[in-house]
Amino acid sequence: MPLSTAGILSSSSAASNRSRNKARYRTKAVSSEVDESLFGDIKSPAQGQSDSPIVLLRDKHTLQKTLTALGLDRKPETIQLITRDMVRELIVPTEDPSGESLIISPEEFERIKWASHVLTREELEARDQAFKKEKEATMDAVMTRKKIMKQKEMVWNNNKKLSDLEEVAKERAQNLLQRANKLRMEQEEELKDMSKIILNAKCHAIRDAQILEKQQIQKELDTEEKRLDQMMEVERQKSIQRQEELERKRREERIRGRRQIVEQMEKNQEERSLLAEQREQEKEQMLEYMEQLQEEDLKDMERRQQQKLKMQAEIKRINDENQKQKAELLAQEKLADQMVMEFTKKKMAREAEFEAEQERIRREKEKEIARLRAMQEKAQDYQAEQDALRAKRNQEVADREWRRKEKENARKKMETEAELRKSRLEQVAFKEHALAVQVQRDRDEFERILRAQREQIEKERLEEEKKATGRLQHANELRRQVRENQQKEVQNRIATFEEGRRLKEEAQKRRERIDEIKRKKLEELRATGLPEKYCIEAERKANILPATSVN
């Protein structure tokens, strides 16, 4: 619609009044929720713009065309304003002289108008539902497109020919995946137990080999000890023989010396008489010499005896040292065996404690799961009972309210009928007094009362039907909720059954994978060259490992 001159004038007057009232403006609130686009673009204070724009529901181009069509852009239009004291000629401006007016488009005005509308709760819920449905539809479309693109990508990846580098990368990725799966499977309790069994078999094999090696070394040491004892005994016998030979030679020398002395004495016996003194002297010298020889012999015998004692002491010391070394070696071996036995006992005790702890944790988990399931089933049964009890209570409340209202209506009806009867009696008395005059009036009154009664009865019937419909809808809603709860419970049980079946299948597959890995480990153990008896013992222990229970 074209903009009228009166509209422009009224807008200018309103702007002038607002400018005059600016000084009397008081702040009502610190913050405001008014659309800022109503105030136009933010301008600097230097431009002299006020904060009271005039809103014209036309854009600049439409306004310019309108003014051009009216001819206002060529010749200014004047308006004569007559007041009580003067007459003025006012020029209608073609532009906003103050520069404070805001010109917005109809679309912007409609947007501001729509934004200022306060939505009700139903409208907000409807808008939220529409937004939620739109979002779900968008997400479904996105997921569908993603699935289609993923399928196309899988088909393209399966059909395309890989390059050498991609083949190497693919093979490396598969190897890494297999290694990761293998490492993940190694963390299973059965495989850990299998690794412990294999390690235990290796330890037993190493320990038996060490024991055999110790026995061999001990046997060699005993043989060497016997050989050294024999050598020392032979050396001792030789030393004794040499000592006896030396004693024999010395005795022979003494005997030969004595014989020579006797021969010399016999030879010089003839000269004794002549050389008595000389002989006596010689005899004395000879006796001294004999004594000296005897002393030397005694000293020599004592020295040889001391050497013999020293040699025996040395031999005893060597024997004692050998016995001491033997005792120390036996003590070390015994200590090593005790340490090995203590380590084995402690290890077995730790393993027993660990297995007992694992068994206790498993039993506690089973008890907790059973308790949670019992609580869940009890809560579901309790919720269903509460829903049924709540529905029954609501139904009883509704029935009591209906009976109360029925009694109230019956009481009112009886009161009304009593009043009617009383009124009728009065009317009959009045009719008897002035029957001719009041016949038509009584008939009209009777018809009015009868019509009111019928309307009241119809109204009560409609209200009763409405209440019955409401009760029926409420009962149907309760039954629907009970059915939904029962269906949810059935679905939960089906889901629980499916979950148990899936867990059982996964446990079976896991059991097969673990058995395959056990067989491979036993084959690798045999491939290491371990004796067959240890392999058989490890296989026997691996076959009696307990399987993981699935709840």
Swiss-Prot record:
<dbReference type="GO" id="GO:0016208">
    <property type="term" value="F:AMP binding"/>
</dbReference>
<dbReference type="GO" id="GO:0097729">
    <property type="term" value="C:9+2 motile cilium"/>
</dbReference>
<dbReference type="GO" id="GO:0036126">
    <property type="term" value="C:sperm flagellum"/>
</dbReference>
<keyword id="KW-0969">Cilium</keyword>
<dbReference type="InterPro" id="IPR043597">
    <property type="entry name" value="TPH_dom"/>
</dbReference>
<comment type="function">
    <text>Microtubule inner protein (MIP) part of the dynein-decorated doublet microtubules (DMTs) in cilia axoneme, which is required for motile cilia beating. It is an AMP-binding protein that may facilitate dynein ATPase-dependent ciliary and flagellar beating via adenine nucleotide homeostasis. May function as a donor of AMP to AK8 and hence promote ADP production.</text>
</comment>
<dbReference type="GO" id="GO:0005634">
    <property type="term" value="C:nucleus"/>
</dbReference>
<keyword id="KW-0963">Cytoplasm</keyword>
<dbReference type="Pfam" id="PF13868">
    <property type="entry name" value="TPH"/>
</dbReference>
<dbReference type="GO" id="GO:0005930">
    <property type="term" value="C:axoneme"/>
</dbReference>
<comment type="subunit">
    <text>Microtubule inner protein component of sperm flagellar doublet microtubules. Interacts with AK8; dimerization with AK8 may create a cavity at the interface of the dimer that can accommodate AMP. Interacts with CFAP52. Interacts with ENKUR. Directly interacts with DNALI1. Interacts with DNAH11. Interacts with DNAI1.</text>
</comment>
<keyword id="KW-1186">Ciliopathy</keyword>
<dbReference type="GO" id="GO:0005576">
    <property type="term" value="C:extracellular region"/>
</dbReference>
<feature type="region of interest" description="Disordered">
    <location>
        <begin position="1"/>
        <end position="30"/>
    </location>
</feature>
<keyword id="KW-1056">Heterotaxy</keyword>
<keyword id="KW-0282">Flagellum</keyword>
<dbReference type="GO" id="GO:0005879">
    <property type="term" value="C:axonemal microtubule"/>
</dbReference>
<dbReference type="GO" id="GO:0090660">
    <property type="term" value="P:cerebrospinal fluid circulation"/>
</dbReference>
<dbReference type="GO" id="GO:0097728">
    <property type="term" value="C:9+0 motile cilium"/>
</dbReference>
<keyword id="KW-0206">Cytoskeleton</keyword>
<feature type="region of interest" description="Disordered">
    <location>
        <begin position="461"/>
        <end position="489"/>
    </location>
</feature>
<dbReference type="GO" id="GO:0060296">
    <property type="term" value="P:regulation of cilium beat frequency involved in ciliary motility"/>
</dbReference>
<dbReference type="InterPro" id="IPR033253">
    <property type="entry name" value="CFAP45"/>
</dbReference>
<dbReference type="GO" id="GO:0030317">
    <property type="term" value="P:flagellated sperm motility"/>
</dbReference>
<keyword id="KW-0175">Coiled coil</keyword>
<protein>
    <recommendedName>
        <fullName>Cilia- and flagella-associated protein 45</fullName>
    </recommendedName>
</protein>
<dbReference type="GO" id="GO:0160112">
    <property type="term" value="C:axonemal B tubule inner sheath"/>
</dbReference>
<keyword id="KW-0966">Cell projection</keyword>
<dbReference type="GO" id="GO:0061966">
    <property type="term" value="P:establishment of left/right asymmetry"/>
</dbReference>
<dbReference type="GO" id="GO:0060287">
    <property type="term" value="P:epithelial cilium movement involved in determination of left/right asymmetry"/>
</dbReference>
<comment type="similarity">
    <text>Belongs to the CFAP45 family.</text>
</comment>
<feature type="coiled-coil region">
    <location>
        <begin position="157"/>
        <end position="526"/>
    </location>
</feature>
<keyword id="KW-0225">Disease variant</keyword>
<dbReference type="GO" id="GO:0005929">
    <property type="term" value="C:cilium"/>
</dbReference>
